[in-house]
């Protein structure tokens, strides 16, 4: 078996939950529902969900019905909100929702009609839904021009109960919070329109990680942190006590000394400027190591940075370890996270990788592929 793996520190996950809980102030603290979409941001949703459930979190959120089913099959009993709102054009998606006791998000009249017909057919009494409204994101959610028809459809189907009202904030991590404040104003207007139809949601929610850390007015009844649970602050300087949860490591499987002027890798994009020692490591872009790190990124060996030499391949990556004294076969190589070694202590963060590859830390985490096995630590 190759030595490449992702180590998930569940103690850090619990720590981050407590940090976020402590940051919620006021007479009525909102509930934290953890967002575990995309396999819990690459950390492994079942194990993360079990840890959060034991830690007392009151609910979870996912994007897809398939993600919710995976958690139910793993034995998770918490309420699970299916935020994507796509259940297929027929009724079978809603049948799964009801059978597995999930909380559906809806945003158009057709969804409500289909769900109501399933509830009547299965004689389930009432099923609670969360209505998503679009206040400025422009993706999913009932738009202002549609909201009257959607609310009227809900009002005429008593078997579908408006349990929650939600929206998604587009710019909560921006320097200027003007857009977010306007979204919250529109959300308040829609809540009042719902009440005019006799619909009063039990809970309201809008805050993602950035909003819950920056805008107390957006906290409402539930907050939905995602990336912050995994130790990534959505805004520089916010929540400095968060701890990264995942660490990606491998080992040196080959060492080679090459002459000055030799070229290596696909396209021969790296040329030795001196006699050099090159280490080969069994991790590549198929594992989530971005090809954009070719000749730009680095890894940690013996606690010291070693530059990536040449193009990142599908399964393998080469490092220039000429300046890493004592590098040898079997040495640990860390591509993401912290390493303590005989030459010092080093850290490569998801934010650093994102900066080098022109993306965001969210993508760095979710790009770690499933062929990289997750190992869970309880220090």
UniProtKB/Swiss-Prot annotation:
The keyword GTP-binding does not apply. It comes from the Bacteria. Substrate binds at residues 139, 314. GO terms for molecular function: alanine racemase activity; pyridoxal phosphate binding. Its cofactor is pyridoxal 5'-phosphate. The modification N6-(pyridoxal phosphate)lysine is found at residue 37. InterPro entries: Ala_racemase, Ala_racemase/Decarboxylase_C, Ala_racemase_C, Ala_racemase_N, Ala_racemase_pyridoxalP-BS, PLP-binding_barrel. It catalyses: L-alanine = D-alanine. Pathway: Amino-acid biosynthesis; D-alanine biosynthesis; D-alanine from L-alanine: step 1/1. Gene3D superfamilies: Alanine racemase, Lyase, Ornithine Decarboxylase, Chain A, domain 1. The active site is at 37 (proton acceptor), 266 (proton acceptor). Keywords: Isomerase, Pyridoxal phosphate. GO terms for biological process: D-alanine biosynthetic process. One of its GO terms (cellular component) is cytosol. Its EC number is 5.1.1.1. Catalyzes the interconversion of L-alanine and D-alanine. May also act on other amino acids. HAMAP family: Ala_racemase (MF_01201). Belongs to the alanine racemase family. This is Alanine racemase. The lineage of its organism: Bacteria, Pseudomonadati, Myxococcota, Polyangia, Polyangiales. The gene is alr.
């Amino acid at each position: 078996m190759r030595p490449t793996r992702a180590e998930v520190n569940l103690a850090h996950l619990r720590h981050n939950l407590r940090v976020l809980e402590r940051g919620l102030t006021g007479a009525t603290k909102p509930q934290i529902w953890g967002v575990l979409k995309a396999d819990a941001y690459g950390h492994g949703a079942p194990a993360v969900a079990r840890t959060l459930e034991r830690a007392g979190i009151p609910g979870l959120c996912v994007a897809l019905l398939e993600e919710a089913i995976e958690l139910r099959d793993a034995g998770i009993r918490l309420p699970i909100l299916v935020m994507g709102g796509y259940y297929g054009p027929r009724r079978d998606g809603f049948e799964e929702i009801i059978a597995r006791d999930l909380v559906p998000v809806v945003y158009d009249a057709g969804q409500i009609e289909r769900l109501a017909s399933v509830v009547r057919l299965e004689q389930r009494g009432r099923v609670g839904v969360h209505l998503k409204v679009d206040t400025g994101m422009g993706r999913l959610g009932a738009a202002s021009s549609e909201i009257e028809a959607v609310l009227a459809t809900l009002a005429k189907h008593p078997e579908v109960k408006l349990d929650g009202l939600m929206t998604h904030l587009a710019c909560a991590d921006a320097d200027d919070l003007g857009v977010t404040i306007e979204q919250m104003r529109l959300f308040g207007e829609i809540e009042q329109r719902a009440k005019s139809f006799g619909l009063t949601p039990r809970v309201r929610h809008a805050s993602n990680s950035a909003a819950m850390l920056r805008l107390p007015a957006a906290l409402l009844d539930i907050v939905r942190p995602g990336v912050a649970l995994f130790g990534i602050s959505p805004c520089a300087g916010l929540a400095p006590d968060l701890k990264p949860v995942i660490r990606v490591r491998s080992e040196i499987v080959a060492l080679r000394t090459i002459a000055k002027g030799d070229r290596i890798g696909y396209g021969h994009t790296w040329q030795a400027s001196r006699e050099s020692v090159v280490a080969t490591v069994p991790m590549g872009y198929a594992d989530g190591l971005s090809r954009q790190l070719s000749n730009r990124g680095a890894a940690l060996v013996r606690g010291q940075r070693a530059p990536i030499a040449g193009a990142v391949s599908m399964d393998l990556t080469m490092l220039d370890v000429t300046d890493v004294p004592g590098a040898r076969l079997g040495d640990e190589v860390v591509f993401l996270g912290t390493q303590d070694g005989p030459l010092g202590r080093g850290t490569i963060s998801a934010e650093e990788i994102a900066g080098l590859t022109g993306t965001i830390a969210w993508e760095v985490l979710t790009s770690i592929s499933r062929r990289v096995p997750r190992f869970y630590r309880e220090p």
